[in-house]
Each structure stands twice: as C-alpha cells, then as structure tokens.
C-alpha cells in the first residue's frame, strides 16, 4: 500500500540490520509501492510477490478466499487514520469547515475503486452530506501517494490523505490538517498476507508484529491493532 511505504522502509531497514547482525547473512527486502487494488490485480495475474501489505481488509480477504495466500497468515498490522490536508498553513480548520467554502477549485482524493483511503474519503464526504456538492470538484489520484503529490504541488488546494503521510519521519511537512472523525467512515484495517511459502517471508512478517516494529508503526501516525 502506498500510504505505508515510508513506514515499511524503516521496518525493512531495521529488519535487514537485525538479520545481518544475527546470522551474518543479511536479508534484503525489496519494497514495491502502489495502490492496493492494483497490486491485488497483479497478484491475481501471477506477480511473484512474497508478501502483500494492503491498505484494507478487503483485498487481503479476497486473496485468502481465492487460495492465493498461506493459510493463517492474514493479520492486521496497522489502523489507518484519514485526514483532510492542505500544504497551506492555517487553511484547513480544526473542524473541517473549509469544505463548505467555495474558494478551492479541486479537492484531491485517491481513486475509491483502487485505493482504500479514497473509498474512506468518499464515505466521509457522503456521511457529512457533502458528496453531491463537491463531487464535481474532485481530482482522483491512482493511489494515496499521487493524491498527496497533487496537494503538495499546489495542483489541488486540499485533499484527503493518510495521517501517516504527514508524519513521515525525517521529512518536515508544512500545511494544515483536520483529522476526520472515525465515526464517518469505516475503520481502515490494513492487513498483510504471506503469498509464498518462504521462511524469510514468515520471519519478516513475524518481525512486523514485534514490539520494535509496532513502535515504528505508531510513531508513523497509525493506530495499533
């Protein structure tokens, strides 16, 4: 999932260092970011991934139902948090009332058909009674990373992204944001699965569940399962 890419880079680096120290043979983790929907399609078409980190339950569950994962390996690794963000300081208020203004041309969301955070953004807008008024102003990113770029570049004045994206360790993110109440969208349970019968894959997933990794996940702006 694109939203968890920076977090997974930190976890993968920590894992690689740990394996080098314990066994003398460092395991290398190759991360391939993209929308959960796109990766799901690639896996169904035979992409040789070992592990899949989705931004939702749905794709992980579908892969399980299709017999594409190792039995008993599906688990929740993080709870996503949706925010409305603008790269402009003091533009987004603490209640999200900016959505009722008419001074922005575009509102960015990830494609709801491909990206779980886009689906959550649509759910939130519908729950808040704003979908009808704002749907013509929506610009859709293929994934949450592209959606973030739309906003950070100024092509969209504001949009819905993952809280983890502005909590990216080592990078100072300017702007203003409102954390969307979790009562207006379905919980974003991000799940992982093991796709290949691999000892290293099992070991890496076990490391993701460790207190060391959970601390990284929490500090990156996620809730813990």
Located regions from the model:
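Exported/periplasmic ABC-transporter solute-binding proteins
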Residues: 1-33, 37-47, 54-57, 61-67, ...
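Extracellular glycoside hydrolase catalytic/binding regions
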Residues: 70
């Amino acid at each position: 999932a694109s939203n968890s890419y920076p977090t997974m880079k930190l976890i993968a680096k920590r894992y690689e260092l740990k394996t080098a120290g314990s066994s003398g043979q460092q395991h290398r983790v190759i991360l391939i970011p993209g929308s959960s929907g796109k990766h799901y399609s690639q896996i169904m078409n035979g992409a040789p991934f070992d592990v899949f980190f989705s931004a939702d339950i749905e794709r992980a569950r579908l892969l399980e139902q299709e017999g594409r994962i190792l039995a008993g390996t599906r688990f929740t690794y993080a709870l996503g948090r949706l925010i409305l963000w603008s790269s402009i300081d003091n533009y987004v208020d603490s209640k999200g009332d900016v959505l009722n203004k008419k001074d922005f041309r575009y509102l960015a969301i990830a494609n709801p058909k491909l990206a779980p955070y886009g689906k959550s953004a649509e759910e939130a807008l519908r729950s808040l009674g704003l979908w009808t008024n704002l749907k013509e102003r929506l610009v859709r990113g293929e994934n949450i990373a592209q959606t973030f770029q739309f906003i950070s570049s100024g092509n969209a004045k504001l949009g819905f992204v993952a809280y983890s994206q502005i909590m990216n360790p080592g990078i100072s993110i300017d702007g203003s944001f409102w954390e969307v109440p979790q009562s207006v969208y379905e919980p974003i349970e991000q799940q992982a699965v093991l796709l290949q019968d691999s000892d290293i894959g099992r070991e890496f997933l076990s490391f993701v569940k460790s207190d060391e990794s959970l601390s990284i996940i929490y500090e990156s702006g996620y809730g813990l399962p």
